[in-house]
Amino acid sequence: MKFALMVSEGPYTHQASDTAWNFANAAIAKGHEVMRVFFYHDGVYNATRLTEPPQDDRHFVNRWSALKEQHNVDLVVCVAAALRRGIKDEVLAPGFRISGLGQLVDAGIKADRTVTFGD
């Protein structure tokens, strides 16, 4: 099965990012494909390399970057949501790219299921 994910909450303010990352890894481990993760609203904070969590905490940005590197998952950050929050190409972590809502629509068309994480 081919999945597309949308994450609409920040990494340290809501469980959505943690749950989405765990879902993506579990799906891949079961032989499914996660074709794209679209970060929308406060979810764009998952993509900034400026995040510096304490050493004893999860580093969501690095986790997502590793998912891209290991499984070639397309990590797309909504351009409008990113710009509203001061996130530009210069501060994106490795593996992320900025694009428009058309990428979410495209993922919804190509994927068998689109799963949303966040309120």
Enumerate the predicted regions with their spans.
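Short, glycine-rich nucleotide/cofactor-binding loops
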Residues: L5-D18, N46-E52
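Short beta-strand segments
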Residues: M6-S8, F38-Y40, V79, T116-G118
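Short internal beta-strands
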Residues: A24, M35-Y40, D74-V79
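Short, active-site-adjacent cap segments at secondary-structure transitions
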Residues: V44-A47, L83-R85
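Short glycine-enriched, charge-decorated loop/helix-capping segments at active-site entrances
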Residues: L50-Q55, L92-P94
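A glycine-rich helix N-cap at a beta->alpha junction
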Residues: P53-A81
